[in-house]
Amino acid sequence: MCEYCLIHEEDTFFGLEVDHIIAEKHGGETKLENLCCACLTCNRYKGSDIATLDKETRALVRLFDPRFDVWAAHFELEGASIVGKTKVGEATVRLLKLNLEERLLERGILQSLGRYQGNQE
């Protein structure tokens, strides 16, 4: 399962990729504690980013870290939308474009088929 948007590998055309949570160019190592599974779309939008600017304050906000953060503490599912509950969640939703129209459509279809429930924690 993608550790950012929670889509299952079997429901993606391209499967999952291994993402360096902290990119090597930022000093991240290729160790299990710095690697996670990501769908192609999340991984492409995240790229080597580890933070982004807050939309309102322009302060630097780190991105969600699947190894140290709990998904349900930073995000919630409202229909097919993934909503950030914290600054980290909001920044991650925005940077990874988790609520693009086509992503909402995909999650909505999967929900109607009982194949996407988000995080059940």
State each model region's role.
Residues 1, 26-29:
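Short, charged surface segments at domain edges that flank catalytic/cofactor-binding sites
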Residues 8-10, 29, 33, 44-121:
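Extended charged
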Residues 1-16, 36-46:
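Short cysteine-rich loop/turn motifs with clustered Cys
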Residues 17-26:
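Short Cys/His-rich Zn2+-coordinating modules
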Residues 20, 33-34:
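Hydrophobic alpha-helical segments
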